UniProtKB/Swiss-Prot annotation:
Belongs to the G-protein coupled receptor 1 family. The chain crosses the membrane at residues 31-55, 69-89, 109-130, 152-173, 204-229, 260-283, 304-325. Principally expressed in the tubules of the renal medulla. Specific expression is seen in medullary and cortical thick ascending limbs; lower levels are detected in cortical and inner medullary collecting ducts. Not detected significantly in the glomeruli. In the brain, expressed in all types of glial cells. GO terms for molecular function: prostaglandin E receptor activity. It holds the Pfam family 7tm_1. Keywords: Cell membrane, Disulfide bond, G-protein coupled receptor, Glycoprotein, Lipoprotein, Membrane, Palmitate, Receptor, Transducer, Transmembrane, Transmembrane helix. Glycans are attached at residues 16, 193. It comes from Rattus norvegicus. Residues 1-30, 90-108, 174-203, 284-303 are extracellular. This is Prostaglandin E2 receptor EP3 subtype. GO terms for cellular component: brush border membrane; cell surface; neuronal cell body; nuclear membrane; plasma membrane; proximal neuron projection. Disulfide bonds join 107-184. The keyword Zinc does not apply. The gene is Ptger3. The lineage of its organism: Eukaryota, Metazoa, Chordata, Craniata, Vertebrata. Its main location: membrane.
Amino acid sequence: MAGVWAPEHSVEAHSNQSSAADGCGSVSVAFPITMMVTGFVGNALAMLLVVRSYRRRESKRKKSFLLCIGWLALTDLVGQLLTSPVVILVYLSQRRWEQLDPSGRLCTFFGLTMTVFGLSSLLVASAMAVERALAIRAPHWYASHMKTRATPVLLGVWLSVLAFALLPVLGVGRYSVQWPGTWCFISTGPAGNETDSAREPGSVAFASAFACLGLLALVVTFACNLATIKALVSRCRAKAAASQSSAQWGRITTETAIQLMGIMCVLSVCWSPLLIMMLKMIFNQMSVEQCKTQMGKEKECNSFLIAVRLASLNQILDPWVYLLLRKILLRKFCQIRDHTNYASSSTSLPCPGSSVLMWSDQLER
């Protein structure tokens, strides 16, 4: 979804003429290129780190957790590589999308790709939050009942989302060129030359289902992460009362709580505006396709474009909030602690080193 990062003025919003895009030179095309490169680097680093950690792990549960993170990074990476080059091509050609894709097949592929990789990322993040909450709040039940391997679950989620995204190909829903004319996504209402009564019920149902599924995934993720934080705090207090490495438990709890809150903040900032705005536009019987033919839609169109840009940021931030940033912070913590210990010649708790799953090792005890 990184490809939608481009200036609003790159295509004339209120004209049906087949004119070249305004400002589609090297400056405007730098946006999607920068987003694609940034996302590629972050997700590629995350995947390399997951592969290295996966080979050193013996516990199936730890391997499942790493597999989920790796799958999330792979999903974000492939989604960017499939969409960004298309948008870059549109900008470099300085032609309207309809001229480059008169059959509409590329638009359908682009919209399907954004739907599959956007929604699957949300659902995988939600599944990870559920598993994390069960493992921490009910460890004995989790150990005895959760025998399902991660790979079938991840494949099931991806195939289910793919089947859902294929509905417009079967006639339920519609993918259309979105303002300013450099990308395609789910249509939320009538096209620019249609009236309100011309809306297809299938398009409304499909767009509503996407928004509701996304919001449901966000709610589940939030609820599970909050439940996990609460359980961690309660266990930390119990350990402190029993004087069982209270300092270490306090540090682990703080680090994990900060990471989970960071995940919630990133998801809410990146996805909530788009999903809520889609429902609002469906309710108001509006589509950003109308921006090309109707005056007075500038505010709504700009807001929707900003919301999509925020959603595209999620693919770049995912590897950092789930893996890379935590690893960097842990390594920095070890460096500071080792320096302090050397200066004071005092003993301390063992350093987690490069282990990304240090906190999960401790929580299982």
